[in-house]
Structures are given as structure tokens and as C-alpha cells.
Amino acid sequence: MSEDNSQGREYTLEADSELRFEIEQKNAKVLVTLLTGFAELFGTELVKKKKYEFGVGAKVAIFTYQGCVIHVSGQMDVCYISKETPMVQYINCHAALEQFRLEAEQRDKRGPSVLIVGPMDVGKSTLCRILLNYAVRVGRRPLYADLDVGQGAISVAGNVATILIERPASIEDGFAKTAPLVYHFGHKSPSGNSVLYNAVVSKMAEVTLQSLDANKRTKSSGIIVNTCGWVKGSGYEHLLHAARAYRARAIFVLDQERLYNDLLRDVPANVHVVLLPKSGGVVERSKGLRHESREQRIKEYFYGNARTPFYPFSFEVKFQDLRLYKIGAPPLPDSCMPIGMKAEDNKKKVVAVTATPALLHHILTLSFAESTDDDVIGTNIAGFCCVTEVDMERQSVMLLSPQPRPLPPNALLLWSELQFMDNHA
């Protein structure tokens, strides 16, 4: 049931409580102003008297350690104050990480690598945001690695990515995503190609751990790693692989005791495994909502948002000028493989893709690799384009791209199973 609060209402929050609201109406707009006291949104402090605007899809939890008064106006689907919040436990986790960072600083060692794990819809990316914000507020410069290919907090879904966090996230837009390191995966779940997923995670971990050494402040700040919500069977094996690859010092487990106990059993004794509750404000998303969220991120990549609109380009590329590949060949039994190769090597093989009508709506990744002889898996990507039309008569495709024509010389495009219906007016 929606709550029409167009005239505005003041909410008085006691210490250690939070105001939660959700917006699901398509054109709804909610304005929030901190009137007195101190409050924060996922670790970012609100500025007094400044109006913050939230739109459709927003799930907001404004927390206060000391008490505050907040003015809210607009149409919300849910709005309430809760005193049951795990924020005190989350700040205790930050304090423990800060202790690790101080030790690393004194000994000129790398700061802690921390994995945030748990099933879907328990607030993993929110906890990452809180811990990163708290870190930069005390002068740290941590790295943020996102291994969740199903949603994509840094890049679009289907990729793993890392960024350097130098300032707190914007209340309305999140972290600035400048100069990310992004590796192509091409699937919405690690199950799409488990061998490739582990290879991409290993490469990302290797490169980012080395990059810590380039700057003293970043070195001691460490890495916060967001993971997928697939935690059983092969998904659990992927978590263990990520913990090894990133040399995890701590693993924070959200809301699943079984996963917590499995990790206690399977990771080295020097890794701190901590069980944390999820926030009562976390909302479970249906498959449809998760799909909408993916689509929205892709749309924002091409078109921006209401505050910062982008104007992408559309241009034709002939089939003969398309250098299109995918990573992972169809599986073959070991007996059919060349001598010295295993079937799993085929999962990392770069194979040519023929342009057909099946390409329509697919996202293509533009790689910085110039040929298939390069390390395509371990090469950063330049960006994305979307196939909006396939013309078999003209032997051409229409591409939606943030950059004007032509494609860069020697452009190597990688196929992704991600699709985007470009119906932008």
C-alpha cells in the first residue's frame, strides 16, 4: 500500500534507529532533508538542510547514531522507523578492519582482503558500501572488487570489476565509477562457464593485489570483495576459490549459519570468519525484479540518468568489419582434444562468432586486446555496445555505442549472453 506524503512529514529518530522507505511507483519522486542531528545513508553522511531526491526502485535506510529529525515528502510504497538494525555490528566490523590496517601500516604490509558472502538478497553490496564509506571517512583508500556477475555494482552484469574508492559514495548515485578495471565474463551466473569464471577471478585478484603496492595509503587500506549469491555446490567452490585468490584475511557471512560453519571448516585457521545478521530492511527480489535491475544498469550505461543524461550514438558496421569472438568453445571429451590439452582448456578458448540474426539485442564487449593471440581473458575492456539491428541483406549490424563511429582500429568484440531491448524514445 503506497503512502502519499506529498505535503511532507517530519520523522524523529532516536539514537541507533533508522528510517526505511521503498519507492516502486514508476514516476514517483521522494525528497529527503536532514533538519537536525546527524544521519547517514549506508555510511555516507547526510548534509543538513540539503534536499536529496530518490526515484523508482530506491530502497533507503537512513541511520542515526545520535538521533535526528528528517523531513520526507513524496509517494512511497513503504515507510517506517525501525530500532532493530545491525548497524552497530557493522561498525564493529569496520573497527576490526581498521585495526588490521593500522598493523599493516606499521609493518608496511598489505591491508586486509575481506570477502562479503551470503545468499541472494541479504544486503552484501550494501554492507560493502557501508564498510568502504567508513574506510574513506577515516582517510583510507580501499579497493572495491565486485565478483557478482549477476547484477554488477561497478560495471554492467556479466563482468567482474574493481575500482579505487577515494571519497564516500554520493547519496543519490553511489560511488564514482571512474577508471574501473573490468574483465569480460559474458554470462549472468558463474555456472555459465565455471572454468572461465575462476580464471577471470584469479586474474583480477592477481592484478589488484599487485596494484596495492603502487600506493602506500592504498596498500594498507586493503580490498573489500563483493561476491555472488550462489553459495551451494559449485557456487560454494567459487567462494573458496575467491578466498584463496584474494588471500582473504576475513570473511563476513550474512544471514546463513550453514555457510558460516562450512567456511569455518574449509578455510585456513588464520582467516577470521564472522557471522552477521542481515538488516530487516533488506528486500527479497523476484527473478523479474533482478532482470529489471540488470536492464536498468545497462540503460544507465548508455543513457545515463535524469541528473546526468547521456546521448549515445547509433551506427552501421559491415559483417566483414566485425571482429567478433566469444570465450569458451563447445565442450569436447578429453579423447577428442589435441595432445596435452584438457576439456577445460576449451572453456577458455577464444572462438570466432558468425554474425546472424541471433545477435540481435546482445551486449558486445569492446576489449583492449588487439588480437586473439593476446591474453584476452586478462585484458581490461574499453566499454560496451548493443546490437540493435541485424540486416542479412546488407550484411551489416546497427550498434548502439557511447562513442561515435567508427569502431577503434583492430577492435576486438566479445559476445555476451546479456541482452538489452533498446526502446529509449
UniProtKB/Swiss-Prot annotation:
GO biological process, one term: mRNA 3'-end processing
InterPro entries to which the protein is assigned, alphabetical: Clp1, Clp1/Grc3, Clp1_C, Clp1_C_sf, Clp1_N, Clp1_N_sf, CLP1_P, P-loop_NTPase
Protein residues bound to ATP: E18, K59, D121, V122, G123, K124, S125, T126
Superkingdom, taxonomy of origin: Eukaryota
Compartments where located: Nucleus
Keywords attached to this entry: ATP-binding, mRNA processing, Nucleotide-binding, Nucleus
Gene Ontology CC annotations of this record: mRNA cleavage factor complex; tRNA-intron endonuclease complex
A Pfam family matched in the record: CLP1_N
Gene3D superfamilies: Clp1, DNA binding domain, P-loop containing nucleotide triphosphate hydrolases, Pre-mRNA cleavage complex subunit Clp1, C-terminal domain
Gene Ontology molecular functions: ATP binding; polynucleotide 5'-hydroxyl-kinase activity
Keyword Nucleus: yes
Function: Required for endonucleolytic cleavage during polyadenylation-dependent pre-mRNA 3'-end formation.
Similarity comment: family membership: Belongs to the Clp1 family. Clp1 subfamily.
Name of the protein this chain belongs to: Protein CLP1 homolog
The organism's taxonomic lineage, starting at the top: Eukaryota, Metazoa, Ecdysozoa, Arthropoda, Hexapoda
Gene: cbc
